[in-house]
C-alpha cells in the first residue's frame, strides 16, 4: 500500500511522533493506522510522543569544528533545568559529532540517518527523552565548509544560550574570528553588509522614516535628506560591518576586520528558543516539576 503524506500527517497528529518514525510505522504495518500507533508504542516512541504537546523552548546551542567543516546546532528541552543536565549536554555533543561526520542537507535527512550505535538520530533522541523525562528536539543546524585560507570563529554565550559561528577569509587569526563572533552575539546583526539587505526591507524602512519625518512637521524639501541620514542608523542596527565594534566602539567592525587583513564571508547566530512560544514558569515551579519526575 502506498503511504501518502496525508497518512503520515494524520499519524503525527494522533501520536506526536516524528515524521520519519510515522512513515516507517505506516510502512511496517502496510498503512494500518491503528497498527501503526501500536508499532510506535511498542518501539517506545509513543512514550516520547506523549510529551509532544509540550513547548520545548529551552536548551542549548553548540558550535563544533573539525578541520575545514563546522556545525552550529540548537537542541531544545522544556526547562533550563534539564538543559544544564550532563546527559542532555552529552546528547548535544553526540548530535554535533554525527552532523559533522555525515553532513545531512536537511533536518529530515538528519533525523533519519543511522548513528554509530545503530539507532537513527530520532531514535537516539527518543532514548534520551525516555531517560531524561522531557521533550527534546533537534530544532535546527547549519554546516559550513571553509577554504584553506579561511578561518572559523566560534563563540558560546551563557553556556550556549547564544551560539555564533563566523567564517572569515584572508586571515588565519582565530582570535579575530572569535572577536567578531562575540560581537555578533552581543549586537545581533541580521546581515554582513548593507548590500545583503533586501530592497523590499529598505523600501519599507524608507517609507516609515519618511512618514515619521512628515508627521514631525518637517518641510518636504528636507525630508529626503533626513530619511537618508536615518537610513544610515538603520543599517548600523542590522549590518555587522556598519556597527561599532563591541570591544572598541571607536572603530567599526569593518575597520577592525580589514586592519587584520580579513573579510567576513558569513555568520550564523542562534539564540535558544528565538521565535518560539515559551512557558512562563518561575524557577521554584521548575524545581518542583523536576522533583515530581524523580
From Swiss-Prot:
One of its GO terms (molecular function) is translation elongation factor activity. Residues 79-82 are annotated as: Involved in Mg(2+) ion dislocation from EF-Tu. It is found in: Cytoplasm. Keywords: Cytoplasm, Elongation factor, Protein biosynthesis. It holds the Pfam family EF-Ts_N. Its main location: cytoplasm. One of its GO terms (cellular component) is cytoplasm. PROSITE patterns: EF_TS_1 (PS01126), EF_TS_2 (PS01127). Associates with the EF-Tu.GDP complex and induces the exchange of GDP to GTP. It remains bound to the aminoacyl-tRNA.EF-Tu.GTP complex up to the GTP hydrolysis stage on the ribosome. Belongs to the EF-Ts family. This is Elongation factor Ts. It comes from Geobacillus sp. (strain WCH70).
Amino acid at each position: 500500500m502506498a503511504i501518502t503524506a496525508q497518512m503520515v500527517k494524520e499519524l503525527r497528529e494522533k501520536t506526536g511522533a516524528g515524521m520519519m518514525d510515522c512513515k516507517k510505522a505506516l510502512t511496517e504495518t502496510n498503512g494500518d493506522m491503528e497498527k501503526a500507533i501500536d508499532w510506535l508504542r511498542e518501539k517506545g516512541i509513543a512514550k516520547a510522543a506523549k510529551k509532544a504537546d509540550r513547548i520545548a523552548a529551552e536548551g542549548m546551542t553548540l558550535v563544533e569544528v573539525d578541520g575545514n567543516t563546522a556545525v552550529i546546532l540548537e537542541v531544545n528541552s522544556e526547562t533550563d533545568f534539564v538543559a544544564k543536565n550532563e546527559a542532555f549536554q552529552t546528547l548535544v555533543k553526540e548530535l554535533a559529532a554525527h552532523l559533522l561526520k555525515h553532513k545531512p542537507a536537511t533536518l529530515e535527512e538528519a533525523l533519519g540517518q543511522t548513528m554509530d550505535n545503530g539507532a537513527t538520530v530520532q531514535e537516539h533522541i527518543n532514548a534520551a527523552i525516555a531517560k531524561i523525562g522531557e521533550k527534546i528536539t533537534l530544532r535546527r543546524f547549519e554546516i559550513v565548509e571553509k577554504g584553506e585560507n579561511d578561518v572559523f570563529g566560534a563563540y558560546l554565550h551563557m553556556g550556549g544560550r547564544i551560539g555564533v559561528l563566523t567564517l572569515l577569509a584572508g586571515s588565519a587569526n582565530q582570535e579575530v574570528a572569535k572577536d567578531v563572533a562575540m560581537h555578533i552575539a552581543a549586537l545581533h546583526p541580521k546581515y554582513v553588509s548593507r548590500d545583503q539587505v533586501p530592497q523590499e526591507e529598505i523600501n519599507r524602512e524608507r517609507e516609515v522614516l519618511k512618514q515619521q519625518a512628515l508627521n514631525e512637521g518637517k518641510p518636504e524639501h528636507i525630508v529626503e535628506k533626513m530619511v537618508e541620514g536615518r537610513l544610515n542608523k538603520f543599517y548600523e542596527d542590522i549590518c555587522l560591518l556598519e556597527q561599532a565594534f563591541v570591544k572598541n566602539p571607536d572603530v567599526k567592525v569593518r575597520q577592525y576586520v580589514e586592519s587584520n587583513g580579513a573579510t567576513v564571508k558569513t555568520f550564523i547566530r542562534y539564540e535558544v528558543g528565538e521565535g518560539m512560544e515559551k512557558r512562563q514558569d518561575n524557577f521554584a515551579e521548575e524545581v518542583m516539576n523536576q522533583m515530581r519526575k524523580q
